[in-house]
Amino acid sequence: MAEVGEDSGARALLALRSAPCSPVLCAAAAAAAFPATTSPPPPAQPPPGPPALPAEPGPGPVPSTVATATTTAPALVAAAAASVRQSPGPALARLEGREFEFLMRQPSVTIGRNSSQGSVDLSMGLSSFISRRHLQLSFQEPHFYLRCLGKNGVFVDGAFQRRGAPALQLPQQCTFRFPSTAIKIQFTSLYHKEEAPASPLRPLYPQISPLKIHIPEPDLRSLVSPIPSPTGTISVPNSCPASPRGAGSSSYRFVQNVTSDLQLAAEFAAKAASEQQADASGGDSPKDESKPPYSYAQLIVQAISSAQDRQLTLSGIYAHITKHYPYYRTADKGWQNSIRHNLSLNRYFIKVPRSQEEPGKGSFWRIDPASEAKLVEQAFRKRRQRGVSCFRTPFGPLSSRSAPASPTHPGLMSPRSSGLQTPECLSREGSPIPHDPDLGSKLASVPEYRYSQSAPGSPVSAQPVIMAVPPRPSNLVAKPVAYMPASIVTSQQPSGHAIHVVQQAPTVTMVRVVTTSANSANGYILASQGSTGTSHDTAGTAVLDLGNEARGLEEKPTIAFATIPAASRVIQTVASQMAPGVPGHTVTILQPATPVTIGQHHLPVRAVTQNGKHAVPTNSLTGNAYALSSPLQLLAAQASSSTPVVITRVCEVGPEEPAAAVSVAANAAPTPAASTTTSASSSGEPEVKRSRVEEPGGTATTQPTAMAATGPQGPGTGE
């Protein structure tokens, strides 16, 4: 009993818990409940005690019980009083030893050795290694703190805590051990388990509910759908809307921007809600194994910004990415190299060396503080899909505003179509119908088409020009791809002129037909048309413009003369740049003309063969007039593209015979060059010999020759 009396703390409490229903303990509890009221009567009871001794055998059981209670009262009263003091309030923590368990219900508890100088809340025995006031536990919501008051210190989870050290924040569970002893106390916090679980989830809903946004699906589809084309011919879903078109383009952009911002806010809210729910519930990582729509830099920003101290090691970044995005768990390890490259090359990521005091190895990575807010804001912004970009050509309002047609859309120009379908950017009017029904089918064999307009100041600015752009030229096969017979009928001559255009595969040809008659087929009139008042019996004249190949697709100037016959047609053929070694195109004009009367002789105008040079039209023939107003006009027109022209004048012997004809000879393809001969016969004089310049091989010379006939200048021949 002396042992119980000495240790009136923990052992008495242990006895109470071991037998809570014992009558001895009930009596002790009753005695402790009335300590002040029962203390005066005991001194008055001893005098009548001795007379009552003989009467003890009768009521024997009751006095024995009371005697037992009186002998054990000094040890148990203190424990019962301590339990009564601790009863109010919930338990904050639990302290467990080998033979006791103590519930901490007060904000401050003292642990030490019990002595006569002062009491402690939890006595650990009479060991001299334990101070009278050794430890002090204090609770400051929501953490517990330990302060060491004993001179020997204490071990907390193996870490020594000396006397006078700052208060140590305790974890949820830890173990105290007194030095030089085997006495241990197991500490367990009960505050978090009883009150904390329900609190984090309740304030989550008021924060998320205002961010819920409902966007009607039909309205969104109508906003996102592409604007229909005015002509209804071509629809490009991914093309950018043209700003000059439509009055609602600005409002469309505004609504689209607002819609994208709302969707972005909704995505942020949903992602934040999912992350908070996952953290609060302690659930598993997401199960979506698809590749996340974020760049490596965004993944790095997400990982670093989620850290508590805003810095992570390379392994920490890897762990964060694999935890939140399961795709990278099974993916090839090449993404780790990309993460390292982004960290090293991106100027927004700063490498911070680890201090010597910090354990571990490897440097930390941080985000540049100047750009951290902006990068964190864009960390969860999904990347946009790469669409078809729009290119605007700098050729003014008549140029194309959309991308050219690709080879995968062969239906742009079909052989059965009534007209050529053009993009809406060209013109709102229909394109002209091809003159030849087979032209569409022949142009359809070319993989790609481009549309352009002539310069506004040109004579045919209102006429669209079809430019067929074939693939790269092939030197192996020289197969003609265009053969267009046409008929030119003049008002004076019912017979037709056959025009054959033979074009090789790599050649790009642009043909324009311009007529001067008011009721022509196409209705385009030459702007530089001169006076046509004079009437002469002349045949239809064809002008060929085959310019220098180095000019490519540039527009060739048209040589205009003083007068143009009423039914003349101008045919211009412009050749593109050709690869070396690829044969050029050949244009052959066969023009049978009526003989022109000069005195009593008929001078037939023979066929003109041209290959790559300018052909000069024969003007109206009158007496005492040159076919060309001046030889300098021809030289000036051909100075940039052809060799110098040699002009030979042939004068007639007779005084009354007018000029005959003008002829220009150039390089012909397989046939020898044809020349025009002026024959004038007079009595007793021989004919003038024809000028024939041929090489031994049968090919024409490279230097063209022009011969003109003039009026009578007296007898003799001038050269």
From Swiss-Prot:
Compositional bias of kind Basic and acidic residues: 686-695
Origin: domain of life: Eukaryota
Modification Phosphoserine, positions: 87, 199, 209, 225, 229, 239, 243, 281, 285, 402, 406, 414, 427, 431, 445
Keywords, comma-separated and alphabetical: Acetylation, Activator, Cytoplasm, Developmental protein, Differentiation, DNA-binding, Methylation, Myogenesis, Nucleus, Phosphoprotein, Repressor, Transcription, Transcription regulation, Ubl conjugation pathway
Mutant phenotype after disruption: Mutants exhibit a growth deficiency and a severe impairment in skeletal muscle regeneration following injury. They show atrophic skeletal muscles and their satellite cell function is impaired. Double knockouts of CDKN1A and FOXK1 don't show significant differences compared to wild-type.
GO MF annotation terms: 14-3-3 protein binding; DNA binding; DNA-binding transcription factor activity, RNA polymerase II-specific; DNA-binding transcription repressor activity, RNA polymerase II-specific; RNA polymerase II transcription regulatory region sequence-specific DNA binding; sequence-specific DNA binding
Residues the record lists as Phosphothreonine modifications: 231, 233, 408, 422
Modification after translation (UniProt): Phosphorylation by GSK3 (GSK3A or GSK3B) promotes interaction with YWHAE/14-3-3-epsilon and retention in the cytoplasm. In response to mTORC1 signaling, phosphorylation by GSK3 is prevented, leading to translocation to the nucleus.
Residues covered by region (Disordered): 35-67, 399-443, 665-719
Composition bias, Low complexity: 665-685, 696-712
GO CC entries: cytoplasm; nucleus
GO biological process, one term: negative regulation of DNA-templated transcription
DNA-binding region: 291-386
Residues recorded with modification N-acetylalanine: 2
Principal place of residence: nucleus
Listed Pro residues bias regions: 38-62
PROSITE patterns xref list: FHA_DOMAIN (PS50006), FORK_HEAD_1 (PS00657), FORK_HEAD_2 (PS00658), FORK_HEAD_3 (PS50039)
Region Required for interaction with FOXO4 and MEF2C, annotated ranges: 81-406
Tissue distribution of the protein: Expressed in tissues and cells in which the myoglobin gene is transcriptionally active including cardiac and skeletal myocytes, brain and kidney. In the adult brain, expressed in the piriform cortex and the indusium griseum. In the hippocampus, expression is localized to the dentate gyrus and CA3 area. In the cerebellum, expression is confined to the Purkinje cell layer. Present in neuroretinal cells: expressed in rod bipolar cells, amacrine cells and ganglion cells (at protein level).
Cell compartments where the protein resides: Nucleus; Cytoplasm
Region described as Interaction with SIN3A and SIN3B: 2-40
Protein task: Transcriptional regulator involved in different processes such as glucose metabolism, aerobic glycolysis, muscle cell differentiation and autophagy. Recognizes and binds the forkhead DNA sequence motif (5'-GTAAACA-3') and can both act as a transcription activator or repressor, depending on the context. Together with FOXK2, acts as a key regulator of metabolic reprogramming towards aerobic glycolysis, a process in which glucose is converted to lactate in the presence of oxygen.
Protein name (Swiss-Prot/TrEMBL): Forkhead box protein K1
Species for this entry: Mus musculus
